[in-house]
């Protein structure tokens, strides 16, 4: 059994050692909740990794979006190359849930595009939890949605060993029961093929390698791993566990029992609808549910089977669904990254799902059991937590009030201080800002400006461009790839100034930025709350020459708290540096990473700019080959937005052939 072991040339420094000790001691003392209050650039991820190494427990890390989850996953893979680090996010590239609009009598069928690579990673994550303890799963908040029952999933897993008495046809029958398909032509993930006494399987958690089971009579003679593409043998196995092809797979006995319960719930609901004189709704419900029942009888599943998950799991009405968290052993550890953003997302998910289901049930599209195919309520989520560490530079009152231990991480390994904050009047703010921009550009640094409205951002960008300042504007309509391209161009000096509204907070760490300007800082509200201000100030904490200018006529409560907190941190950092003889230094990250991240965006733009009809067949083939290699690399690096963009371009080129 593997143990967590960090591989890094760095050792904990600054505030990291005491933060690690505090968190580890608190968790070992069986405290349920603790907070890691770490300033921007203090190495919170490295602290988390050290806590995991010291505690040696299976760990789930929650992030508030797919991009941040992918970034964290990459970092933890670097820290723990010899352990299992998995990625678990929603597998939908596109998802339109089924819905009904009574006003126009419009029913919208469920429509989804499933990303096969992410589905593979989800299966890889759940199967890893049954095989090892040195497992870290980085997940988005979608992990609080219902997943199949882990007990059923484990029960349906096929365990095969060399020397085991097992007939080939018996194994085939079991594979079909757990939703594998026989396909001798298109051999892909979740399928198997038969060749004489050999049975080839590509498990749900694999894609580029398969398992070959060789039989001698009614005995398993040999188990081998092979490369799906080349067919070459990769190694011998004594044992293999084949997990179900779907998390919602269920045994035949469970299905047969569930059908009777579904039929009973249908009859009860039909009586209710008929009593209310809702004859159309009753007819619709009877027709749709009977069709589902027939499909389940014949195939073992149906489209939308998750709406019957409560019955298939044998749960009582209103009880919480099984989720990824239930796949973990009891002593698991949870980190909630950027908890001030992630926890509100968890709170909001149930309400949105419930309002949509109400309409579907009221108008006869679904049985009431569909209500229980849902995300967890916040109280249910809390109950499922064993021990948790909230991670944030600006934890909310919930995290502070519920934590038995708060570990502050104020000192940065680089010795950098929190930026100096200057207050200037609103009158003449643009002229003053223009002067500060010129001073900053002369020193070779960049500027971030945050405004309150889209209109003001656009006008300011236009004004600065007219004055000859290389300025761009980042708004909410810009997709992930374009956003990364803008950041890359800012770092490379294509732009000197970036203007935005609420986009200059979490995750935008640019060492070249030496000035952050906050316009209309005294306008109280969401964009100028204490949390927002501290996060925005943090964008200037990667450069030793940085400062923040707030343009305001009054000092609001939020401003006052943000400034006092920043000054408190700055004083601690300054004192530490003086005592240890540390000179703050700007750590300039290699721009190569950013260039690699935006390479696809450039290739896509070049392709769109070219008239593909003018390309020769040879040129098209080369372009497809290059883009396919880039797409596979992007998927391997968990950069799925880039991979999807490339896939669409490749299809477009092929269609134009």
From Swiss-Prot:
Keyword Cytoplasm in annotation: yes
Motif Beta-hairpin: where in chain: 91-114
Top-level lineage group: Bacteria
Signal peptide coordinates: none
Any single Gene Ontology cellular-component annotation: excinuclease repair complex
One example GO MF annotation: ATP binding
Subunit structure, as described in the record: Forms a heterotetramer with UvrA during the search for lesions. Interacts with UvrC in an incision complex.
Annotated protein name in UniProt: UvrABC system protein B
Native source organism of the sequence: Clostridium beijerinckii (strain ATCC 51743 / NCIMB 8052) (Clostridium acetobutylicum)
């Amino acid at each position: 059994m593997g143990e967590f072991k960090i591989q890094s040339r760095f050792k904990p420094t600054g505030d990291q050692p005491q933060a690690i000790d505090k968190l580890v001691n608190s968790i070992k003392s069986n405290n349920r909740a603790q907070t890691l209050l770490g300033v921007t650039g203090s190495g919170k991820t490295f602290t988390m990794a050290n806590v995991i190494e010291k505690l040696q427990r299976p760990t789930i890390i929650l992030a508030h979006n797919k991009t941040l989850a992918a970034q964290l996953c990459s970092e933890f893979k670097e820290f723990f190359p010899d352990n299992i680090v998995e990625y678990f996010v929603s597998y939908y590239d596109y998802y339109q849930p089924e819905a009904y609009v009574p006003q126009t009598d419009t029913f919208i069928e469920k429509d989804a595009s499933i990303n096969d690579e992410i589905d593979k990673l989800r299966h890889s994550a759940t199967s890893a939890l049954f095989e090892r303890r040195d497992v870290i799963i980085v997940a988005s908040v979608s992990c609080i949605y219902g997943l199949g029952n882990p007990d059923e999933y484990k029960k349906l897993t096929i365990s095969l060993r060399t020397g085991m008495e097992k007939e080939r046809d018996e194994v085939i029958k079991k594979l079909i029961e757990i939703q594998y398909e026989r396909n001798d032509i298109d051999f892909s993930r979740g399928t198997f093929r038969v060749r004489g006494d050999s049975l080839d399987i590509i498990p749900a958690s694999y894609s580029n390698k398969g398992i070959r089971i060789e039989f001698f009579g009614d005995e398993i003679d040999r188990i081998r791993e092979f490369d799906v593409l080349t067919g070459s043998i990769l190694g011998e196995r004594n044992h293999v566990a084949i997990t179900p092809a779907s998390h919602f797979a269920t045994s035949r006995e469970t299905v047969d029992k569930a059908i009777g319960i579904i039929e009973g719930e249908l009859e009860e609901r039909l009586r209710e609808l008929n009593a209310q004189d809702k004859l159309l709704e009753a007819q619709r419900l009877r027709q749709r549910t009977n069709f589902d029942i027939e499909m389940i009888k014949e195939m073992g599943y149906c489209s939308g089977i998750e709406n019957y998950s409560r019955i298939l799991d044998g749960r009582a009405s209103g009880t919480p669904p099984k989720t990824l968290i239930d796949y973990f052993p009891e002593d698991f550890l949870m980190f909630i990254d950027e908890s001030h953003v992630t926890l509100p997302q968890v709170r909001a998910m149930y309400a949105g799902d419930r309002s949509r289901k109400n309409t579907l049930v009221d108008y006869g599209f679904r049985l009431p059991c569909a209500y229980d195919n849902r995300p967890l309520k916040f109280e249910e989520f809390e109950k499922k937590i064993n021990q948790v560490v909230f991670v944030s530079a600006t934890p909310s009152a919930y995290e502070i009030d519920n934590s038995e231990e708060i570990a502050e991480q104020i000192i940065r390994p680089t010795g950098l201080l929190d930026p100096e904050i200057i207050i200037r009047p609103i009158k003449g703010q643009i002229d003053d800002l223009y002067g500060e921009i010129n001073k900053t550009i002369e020193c070779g640094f960049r500027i971030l400006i945050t405004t309150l409205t889209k209109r003001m951002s656009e006008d300011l960008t236009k004004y600065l461009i007219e004055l000859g300042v290389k300025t761009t504007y980042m708004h909410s309509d810009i997709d992930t790839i374009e956003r990364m391209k803008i950041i890359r161009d800012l770092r490379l000096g294509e732009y000197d100034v970036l203007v935005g509204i609420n986009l200059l907070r979490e995750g935008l760490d640019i060492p070249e930025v030496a000035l952050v300007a906050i316009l209309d800082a005294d306008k109280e509200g969401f964009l100028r709350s204490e949390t927002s201000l501290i996060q925005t100030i943090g964008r200037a904490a990667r450069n030793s020459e940085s400062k923040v200018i707030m343009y305001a006529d009054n000092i609001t409560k939020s401003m006052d708290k943000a400034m006092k907190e920043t000054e408190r941190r700055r004083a601690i950092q300054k004192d530490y540096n003086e005592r240890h003889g540390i000179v703050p230094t700007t750590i300039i990250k290699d721009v190569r990473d950013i260039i690699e991240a935006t390479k696809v965006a450039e290739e896509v733009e070049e392709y769109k700019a070219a008239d593909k009809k003018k390309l020769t067949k040879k040129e098209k083939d080369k372009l497809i080959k290059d883009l396919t290699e880039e797409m596979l690399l992007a998927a391997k690096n968990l950069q799925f937005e880039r991979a999807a963009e490339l896939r669409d371009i490749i299809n477009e080129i092929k269609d134009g052939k």
